[in-house]
Amino acid sequence: MLKLETIFHKEALLVQVDPDHNFLKAVWLKQPTSSEFRKYILLVTEYALARNIKIALFDIRRRSYMEYCDQNWTLKEIFPLFEGNFVKFAYLTKIEGLDLMDTLRLQEAQDNSTLQKTTFKIEHFLDEEQALTWLFE
């Protein structure tokens, strides 16, 4: 059973952690601007790296899309920071939104990148329980 502690709560993003399980959950509460997205993702990344977070659930159902420039920024600046660590990211999406398309692009780019696939995994889910099961297996 997860024991989530809120570490960050702003208008656009809620971040909770369970330090005992090296788990982070980030819930987008609204569509962020590009600058908000980058600022918050950088904060989450710095926290995850400093605390050795290995698994993360990103609930993006209230986020409509990710700007193309932010997708590229994430691939170029954020994902490489996790190289050498075993990390699993689960995206909780809704099937009718564009949010699924942009994170699928991230997953495809990650699958084709030079980062070792055995140490960095991304999957998409419509159901939170299924996402958590995958993250903790």
Per-segment meaning from a language model:
Residues 2-137:
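Amphipathic, Lys/Arg-enriched alpha-helical "gate/interface" segment within cytosolic domains
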